[in-house]
């Protein structure tokens, strides 16, 4: 049995040879990182995934930066503000939001193999996920809502900014059909939807998408769950970034904490990040590299199960992680006891 067992006994179809070549290329390029990370994932340590727009590109959703079609380059910084909305709600919706975010292809988007791998990691390992994406694809991939913080919001949900309204901070509006506000015979499916600004069901004032805008902060609405996110950051032992450009506040928080506490960080992206110290890179498209990591994890679990093959390794992984987690807790208790003994 060799370390390359991940690729043994594969049935190669002529129609997918090119895909398998890409997989093998990515695997060999990142082999040491896959092996190391898979072992760390089985160690019982707490893992936190932080996902960005790059994860959803394969699902047909434009990234925010670093591509020719990126939403970032399409005036998002100018228009993505509460100030712009207050100046002209109709223009905000029709000129900006419905052209860059709440579009039919975004609403119809499905999770790709990267999302599905993360969902499996959450199930196997009990990991948590903080996403910068508003596309709801982690939920579509069956990540439990209690294991997910959508720190930048979610499309098809809305908020009010009228002072004193319960939807200003405490609650989220989830019962509005945006197409009901269409004008001039336009529709979402035709890609030309124009609307009159939707109104708050409570105070009847124009409402905003439930999305963190550039002149807002994470504590501007409870939906963004910033306190929960910060707790997860403090508790985690290993941080795995996927498809992020490290250009927003939440990634800065994670990096500062990880570096100060000397915690391990891994980055899945199409390029190697060289400006952040202590960050190990797995280079390649996340819809390929994340399933490869899952295979490596299954292989490591099989090795620790004395090579016994099983139909599904989920329970084996959970058992190994649980056992190692208990060992870690026992070791920490011993260290705490030793440090508390007076000399």
Curated annotation (Swiss-Prot):
The protein's enzyme class: transferase
Under Gene Ontology molecular function, one entry of this record is:
metal ion binding
Is Ribosomal protein found in the keyword set? Answer: no
Q: Which Pfam families match?
A: SIR2 (PF02146)
Q: Outline the extent of the Deacetylase sirtuin-type domain.
A: 27-300
What broad class describes the main subcellular location of this protein?
Answer: nucleus
Please list the residues that bind Zn(2+): 160, 165, 200, 203
List locations, semicolon-separated: Nucleus
Which parts of the chain are coiled coil?
A: none
| Keyword terms, alphabetized | Metal-binding, NAD, Nucleus, Transferase, Zinc
Query: Superkingdom of the source?
Result: Eukaryota
Q: Which GO terms describe its cellular component?
A: cytosol; mitochondrion; nucleus
Record field: catalytic activity: N(6)-acetyl-L-lysyl-[protein] + NAD(+) + H2O = 2''-O-acetyl-ADP-D-ribose + nicotinamide + L-lysyl-[protein]
Active site feature: 152
InterPro entries for this protein? DHS-like_NAD/FAD-binding_dom, NAD-dep_sirtuin_deacylases, Sirtuin, Sirtuin_cat_small_dom_sf, Ssirtuin_cat_dom
Describe what happens without this gene.
Null cells could not be established, suggesting that sir2E might be essential.
Q: Its Enzyme Commission number?
A: 2.3.1.286
**According to its UniProt record, which protein family does this protein belong to?**
Belongs to the sirtuin family.
Described purpose of this protein according to its UniProt entry? NAD-dependent deacetylase, which plays an important role in the regulation of transcriptional repression. May play a role in cell cycle. When overexpressed, the cell cycle is accelerated.
The record's annotation in PANTHER family points to: NAD-DEPENDENT PROTEIN DEACYLASE SIRTUIN-5, MITOCHONDRIAL-RELATED
What's the protein here called? NAD-dependent deacetylase sir2E
Q: Which organism is it from?
A: Dictyostelium discoideum (Social amoeba)
Q: Gene for this protein?
A: sir2E
């Amino acid at each position: 049995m060799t370390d390359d067992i991940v690729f043994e006994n594969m049935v190669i179809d002529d129609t997918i040879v090119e895909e398998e070549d890409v997989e093998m290329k990515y695997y060999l390029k990142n082999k040491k990182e896959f092996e190391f990370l898979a072992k760390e994932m089985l160690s019982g340590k707490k893992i936190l995934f932080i996902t960005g727009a790059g994860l959803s590109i394969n699902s047909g959703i434009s990234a925010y930066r670093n591509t020719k079609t990126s939403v970032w380059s399409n005036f998002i910084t100018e228009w993505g503000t509460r100030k712009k909305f207050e100046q002209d709600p109709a223009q905000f919706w029709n000129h900006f939001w419905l052209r860059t975010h709440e579009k039919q292809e975004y609403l119809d988007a499905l999770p790709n193999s990267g999302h599905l791998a993360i969902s499996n990691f959450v199930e196997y390992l009990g990991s948590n996920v903080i996403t910068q994406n508003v596309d709801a694809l982690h939920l579509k991939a069956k990540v439990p809502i209690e294991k997910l913080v959508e720190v930048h919001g979610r499309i098809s949900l809305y908020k009010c900014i009228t002072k004193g309204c319960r939807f200003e901070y405490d609650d989220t509006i989830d019962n509005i059909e945006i197409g009901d506000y269409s004008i001039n015979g336009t529709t979402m499916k035709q890609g030309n939807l124009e609307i009159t600004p939707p109104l708050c069901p409570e105070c009847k004032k124009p409402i905003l998408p439930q999305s963190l805008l550039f002149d807002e902060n994470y504590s501007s609405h409870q939906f963004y769950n910033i306190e929960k996110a910060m707790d997860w950051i403090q508790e985690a032992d290993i941080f795995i970034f996927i498809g992020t450009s490290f250009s927003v506040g939440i990634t800065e928080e994670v990096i500062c904490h990880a570096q100060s506490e000397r915690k391990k960080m891994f980055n899945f992206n199409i390029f190697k990040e060289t400006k952040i110290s202590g960050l190990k890179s797995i280079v390649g498209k996340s819809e390929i590299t994340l399933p490869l990591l899952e295979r490596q994890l299954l292989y490591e679990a099989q090795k620790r199960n004395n090579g016994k093959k099983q139909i599904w390794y989920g329970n084996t992984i959970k058992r190994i992680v649980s056992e190692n987690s208990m060992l870690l807790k026992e070791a920490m208790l011993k260290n705490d006891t030793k440090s508390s003994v007076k000399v």
